[in-house]
From Swiss-Prot:
Keywords noted in UniProt: Cell inner membrane, Cell membrane, Lipid transport, Membrane, Transmembrane, Transmembrane helix, Transport
Organism: Escherichia coli O1:K1 / APEC
Acetylation listed as a keyword: no
Ranges of the Periplasmic topological domain: 1-17, 74-90, 166, 248-256, 302-304, 365-366
InterPro entries documented for this protein: LysoPLipid__transptr_LplT, MFS, MFS_trans_sf
Annotated gene: lplT
Protein name: Lysophospholipid transporter LplT
Membrane topology according to the record: Multi-pass membrane protein
A Pfam short name: MFS_1
GO molecular function list: lysophospholipid:sodium symporter activity
Phylogenetic placement of the source organism: Bacteria, Pseudomonadati, Pseudomonadota, Gammaproteobacteria, Enterobacterales
Length: 397
């Protein structure tokens, strides 16, 4: 069935504003909840290697539900899917507030996030189109990164004051996102009437994976974004252990401040990409990807706070410039071939598989006692080499 798309090309339509507000509040809750829950694990004396496990159960939900969430996003009005997904996040955060095992509560938040992602990105192609799609992605990424900036800091600072207050603030953010979703126009479903047989859905998802992988442009985008987000999540957890070792600071807030520097940088980089990169010139983003790994390596050797702030902001600028064009490329090409929701679901599978793999390797490295600074050096070097290999591969094909 052909994809039905209802577009309003304005970047500041009522629907777009509602999407951006909902995304900000939802992402704020995600990031505040991570650091609040990490503080809870520390307070309850969980081992250090369990910290990345928290994120692994979150991304495990993405992988488990990947064959189904794309069809959900394309079979219903995406604004309503976003509202349901934020409701699941609210339930997960509330369960942690009431003393349920934090890993179980965070898994429920992961299920909500898995359902939310294809809808939030897929709806951009229904609210705007053509040359403005990259700019719409820039707005979405800027909103997300602003939420990462404020949410991460709020989670760490509030947790230093009172962990329960931090957890309640996360639940309230998710509640606000549910309300914002109400104001998103109820657009027609992109691909209604598809089979809900689980075997058929899995087969359809695998067909979408195959279709996107066979296309050189979407394959390039999938690999690039997967490497970036896998590395980004690993860096976040590396900072939690790096700060007390390299800087001698043991509070919950400092790692969140450092993460905020990355967030600020990504806002700048996303804005630059929206102005300087088009769907026809996506390869311009590749040098920035290589430099991310180089700067991470240099950062790992620092022992002063000010250079650490500056280098992390630079990593963010490079990251924003690298990932925004790749996201836009996948949405535009994927919308035409397998549907925007399915394209983003396939992207989520790739990104979260990369996260799971990188976090697993990182957790294992911590468990066997490798010092955090050598971990950071090796991590940066491997990332730079991986993006270099991807660029060479893309140019040859």
């Amino acid at each position: 069935m052909s994809e039905s798309v209802h577009t309003n090309t304005s970047l500041w339509s009522k629907g777009m504003k509602a999407v951006i507000v909902a995304q900000f509040l939802s992402a704020f809750g995600d990031n505040a909840l991570l650091f609040a829950t990490l503080a809870l694990l520390k307070a309850q004396f969980y081992p250090e290697w369990s910290q990345p496990i928290l994120q692994m159960v979150f991304v495990g939900a993405y992988i488990l539900f990947a064959p189904f969430v794309g069809q959900v996003a394309d079979s219903f009005a995406k604004g309503r899917v976003m509202m349901f997904a934020n409701g699941l996040k609210l339930l997960g955060a509330a369960s942690i507030c009431f003393g349920i095992n934090p890993f179980l509560g965070y898994t429920l938040v992961g299920v909500g996030a898995a359902a939310y992602s294809p809808a939030k990105y897929g709806i951009l192609g229904e609210l705007t189109t053509g040359s403005k799609l990259v700019k719409a992605n820039g707005l979405m990424e800027a909103s997300t990164i602003a939420a990462i900036l404020l949410g991460s800091v709020a989670g760490g600072v509030l947790a230093d004051w009172h962990i329960l207050v931090a957890l309640v603030a996360c639940a309230l953010a998710y509640g606000g996102a549910v309300v914002a979703n109400i104001y998103i126009p109820k657009l027609a479903a992109a691909r209604p009437g598809q089979s809900w047989n689980l075997i058929s859905m899995t087969r359809s998802f695998l067909n979408a994976c195959t279709s996107l992988w066979r296309n050189g442009e979407t394959r390039f985008s999938l690999v690039g974004t997967s490497l970036f987000w896998g590395a980004g999540v690993t860096l976040r957890f590396l900072l939690v252990l790096w700060v007390p070792v390299a800087l001698g600071i043991t509070d919950n807030a400092t790692p969140t401040y450092l993460n905020a520097m990355v967030a600020i940088g990504i806002v700048v980089g996303a804005g630059a990409a929206a102005k300087l990169v088009t769907l026809e010139t996506v390869s311009r983003c590749m040098p920035a990807g290589i430099l991310i790994g180089v700067v991470v390596l240099i950062f790992s050797l620092q022992h002063e706070l000010l250079p650490a702030y500056a280098l992390l902001m630079l990593i963010g600028v490079l990251g924003g410039f690298f990932v925004v064009p790749l996201n836009a490329l996948l949405q535009e090409r994927g919308k035409k071939s397998v549907g925007a929701g399915n394209a983003i679901a396939v992207q989520n599978l790739g990104e979260n598989s990369a996260m799971l793999l990188m976090l697993g390797i990182y957790s294992l490295a911590v468990m066997v006692g490798i010092p955090v600074v050598p971990i950071g050096i090796g991590f940066g070097a491997l990332f730079a080499l991986a993006i270099t290999a991807l660029w060479i591969w893309q140019r040859r094909h």
